[in-house]
């Protein structure tokens, strides 16, 4: 398998959603999603109704508090968040990870659930929802989340990016994206979580976009660590993937950017480019971004998790 479309933030009628679990699974299959995560707020009551024969799924929960929300993926039972405070969040995350969960920050700048925790060890975070909800020009929370992610990468954290629709109902008026996961082997919870934990993810408006790096006869993929020096980046772009999910806006795909520490662009090329040479610096991260125009306005349309150098 190679970079399959997934939705990692879904709600059923056991929580805030309007769908039954069976309806959610069928709608996911109809939407050609390879896998979803059920993440009802502070409950796992929907787990018993999951059916991987319809759509493979991850058992998860949105740990919702007055100070922000976490996504805990790969859990077997509900997590008690009643006593979670801004100052004990590190111990909560450590306990989740100790029980095998993959832990992410959900919509850190959402007006109804902004991140207010005093997290000390960001290295215990596996992923961050850099994009959330429908893609509109009014959705400024995504720009802030992307900047937060960049700051964490600059601190040396290896954190993957995800998109979260926060799927609750049949709202179809917006343009919704997906998270592409590089799932190796059978499509199931174990392999999907392995991909996310290893940082093999892409947040996208729909377009399929990823890269590999070739260095001294060895090929590296997103999420991996390699040495500094001369390298060749190979880009893979399918502009028509999930095209049915596009909205009424006019989208023009234009350029690929390679971004590194501090959000600095070290390379920009046309979207049709397949291979570029670049000299990687030590102790840096590098992510690829696909840019274009939406109704004439310049917009980021896909972003990969980084590779790292050491």
Predicted segments with their positions:
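A metal-dependent hydrolase metal-coordination microenvironment
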Residues: 1-106, 111-123, 129-151, 155, ...
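Catalytic pocket-lining loop regions of alpha/beta-barrel enzymes
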Residues: 126-127, 194
């Amino acid at each position: 398998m190679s970079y399959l479309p997934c939705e990692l933030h879904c709600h059923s009628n056991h929580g805030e959603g309007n769908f039954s679990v069976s309806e959610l699974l069928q709608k996911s299959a109809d939407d050609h999603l390879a896998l979803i995560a059920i993440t009802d707020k502070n409950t796992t009551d929907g787990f018993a109704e999951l059916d991987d024969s319809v759509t493979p799924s991850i058992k998860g929960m949105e740990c919702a508090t007055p100070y922000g929300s976490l996504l805990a993926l790969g859990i077997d039972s509900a997590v008690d968040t009643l006593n979670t405070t801004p100052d004990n969040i590190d111990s909560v995350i450590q306990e989740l990870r100790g029980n095998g969960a993959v832990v992410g920050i959900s919509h850190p700048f959402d007006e109804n659930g902004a991140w207010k925790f005093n997290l000390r060890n960001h290295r215990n975070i596996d992923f961050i929802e850099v994009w959330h909800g429908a893609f509109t020009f009014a959705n400024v929370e995504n720009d802030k989340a992307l900047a937060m992610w960049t700051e964490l990468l600059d601190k040396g954290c290896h954190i993957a990016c995800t998109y979260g629709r926060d799927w609750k109902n049949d709202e179809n008026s917006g343009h919704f994206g997906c998270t592409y996961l590089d799932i190796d082997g059978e499509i199931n919870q174990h392999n999907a979580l392995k991909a996310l934990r290893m940082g093999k993810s892409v947040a996208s408006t729909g377009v399929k976009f990823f890269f590999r790096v070739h260095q001294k006869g060895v090929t590296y993929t997103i999420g991996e660590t390699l040495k500094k020096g001369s390298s060749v980046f190979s880009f893979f772009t399918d502009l028509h993937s999930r095209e049915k999910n596009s909205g009424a806006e006019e989208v023009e795909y234009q350029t690929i950017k390679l971004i590194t520490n501090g959000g600095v662009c070290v390379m920009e090329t046309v979207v049709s480019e397949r291979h570029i040479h670049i000299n990687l610096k030590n102790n840096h991260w590098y992510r690829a971004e696909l840019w274009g125009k939406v109704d004439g306005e310049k917009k980021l349309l896909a972003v990969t998790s980084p590779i790292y150098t050491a």
